[in-house]
């Protein structure tokens, strides 16, 4: 273009030709004013060399989209809008949804699972950006079950190979506390119930951290625990006016839903505070209960590190005492058994020896006295001559020998039986009494140490309160359930066949059964 041409707006002579798509234009380089436009249509000669081209081929991409995919993308953006997420979150969630939509694992799924996939993409985006949100919130938006949502969430994370960080507990507490109406400047809230958000949130975070360190958060949903911690923290800031307010009324005034497990979490938190209050000297003298312990929540949170260490030290001491008592009880059982065996052996031997010595001496003394008395009586009756004759023949010697042999043997046997029986009975009674007394002491020590005092120990919920699993009994009525007419398959019969003769008889029986229908 000639340089003599000037721009009518600015007077500049810098005029250039600009090809705007298929239209040639003359434009001022300084102000951008269009001096003349090219031809909008082509000539007949140019059109003769052209051919029809599809839009997808001309642009290089296919803008056509299935209805289900478009509906899913719209649903993702709507959920992000409901949660008031930043604009960048929705783009990231849409990209995750498109990746999941292309994966063959999620092609033929139900409508419910498609909704859950949408929610999972939004939830993953929030987790990656440290946006405090819970799985229960997303489940309520997509009307999904938590168990199914959790399974699909894990599946998407594995399939797409995404890195999902854990939820920050502090951010989650702060986010949940913002939803309480009592912590906002509202005219509808009574003055003695209103509280500043920062003050309550700070104490709630400390209470939740204490619950985490005492195993109350393990395996639990966070919202019920945060609700209970917020309620206790709110009460402790003005206990005189707020102790009479119940948890349900607190949630109603705060305009939030009351999760069903919140009451259980509240009792667990109160029990933990009572356990820790034992180790503070100025609280140990007080008889605290679940309501009055809330008044001292600030002191317990301020010294919680010391209190937890003290509780663990006392627990270790209790367990060590229990181990020593167990060892002493086992040793006492073994020692008593050995002592009793030795006493029974030694006592019987000593008793027999003493009895044999004492019985012989007593028997000889009695016989000598009785024989002399009889002899004097016989002599007094005039039988002295006969006695002298018998004595001369040696009868008296034989009689004494027989008496000494027979009478001593019988007397010794009877005395040994009776005395030994009495002695063993007395020893057994005394030894058993002592053994039972010692065993009872050891058993009491064991029972007190196998289950340590709940005041000094913090355990996970699954250990402190285990669920009672129902055990099915195979035959509840015993032998009445077995009639002998139960069905049994051929494979089960073959398991019980042992000898070749039994196998042959079984084959013959099968052949007879096959021949009967043909006959």
UniProtKB/Swiss-Prot annotation:
| Binding annotation for Zn(2+) | 7, 10, 28, 31
Where are this protein's sequence repeats? 173-249
Q: Which cysteines are joined by disulfide bonds?
A: none
SUPFAM superfamilies attached to this UniProt entry: Cyclin-like, Zinc beta-ribbon
**Keywords associated with the record:** Activator, Metal-binding, Nucleus, Oxidation, Repeat, Transcription, Transcription regulation, Zinc, Zinc-finger
* Source species, domain of life: Eukaryota
Which stretches of sequence are listed as region Disordered? 465-487
Q: Which GO terms describe its biological process?
A: cellular response to oxidative stress; regulation of transcription by RNA polymerase III; transcription preinitiation complex assembly
Give start-end positions of each zinc finger (TFIIB-type). 3-36
Q: Name one GO cellular component term.
A: transcription factor TFIIIB complex
Q: Which Gene3D superfamilies match?
A: 2.20.25.10, Cyclin-like
Q: Which CDD domains match?
A: CYCLIN_BRF2
This protein's record includes keyword Transcription = yes
Q: Which PANTHER family match?
A: TRANSCRIPTION FACTOR IIIB 50 KDA SUBUNIT, TRANSCRIPTION INITIATION FACTOR IIB-RELATED
Q: What does this protein do?
A: General activator of RNA polymerase III transcription. Factor exclusively required for RNA polymerase III transcription of genes with promoter elements upstream of the initiation sites. Contributes to the regulation of gene expression; functions as activator in the absence of oxidative stress. Down-regulates expression of target genes in response to oxidative stress. Overexpression protects cells against apoptosis in response to oxidative stress.
Identify this protein by name: Transcription factor IIIB 50 kDa subunit
Question: What species does this protein belong to?
Answer: Xenopus tropicalis
